Amino acid sequence: MAHLLDVNILVAWGWRDHADHDRVVRWIAERKMAHGVKLFTSLIPEMGFVRVSVQRSSGRISVQQAAEVLQGMLKSLGKLHQFLPDDLGATEWPSWCGSAARTTDAHLLMLALRHGLVLATLDAGIPGAMLLT
């Protein structure tokens, strides 16, 4: 199975004080033990991780520090990780994307589907994505 990691997965994985940190750490550990698994990131989730990390109310850090944390996270995945270039424009949207708040979710879902991946997320409001439980 191949997953595109959503911003919220990266944020929860990266910060121990996040409410879903332990759940995401367990899920990633399970993926590391499985065969044939690939975990993808793309520009939007990586930039989202940096943006959210810099804006956190607890333990704010610099952009460079956030990038270093992200780099360490991705390096820890070894060969499981691949970067997925974003090759989608902004001209097609699924019918459920009716507001600005859903545009990133919709774009990432469409990107994942285009490349035969499953979007892994903590957001129950993304139809067709895999909700981490």
Predicted stretch roles:
Residues T41-E46, T104:
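Short, conserved alpha-helical segments within structured domains
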Residues L10, G125-I126:
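Catalytic metal-binding/acid-base residues of hydrolase active sites
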Residues M1-T41, R56-E68:
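Short, well-structured N-terminal submotif of metal-dependent ribonuclease cores
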Residues E30-R31, M73, L111:
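Hydrophobic helix-cap positions at the C-terminus of alpha-helices
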Residues S76-A124:
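Active-site neighborhoods of divalent-metal-dependent phosphate/nucleic-acid chemistry enzymes
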Residues G128-T133:
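Active-site regions of enzymes building and remodeling cell-envelope glycoconjugates
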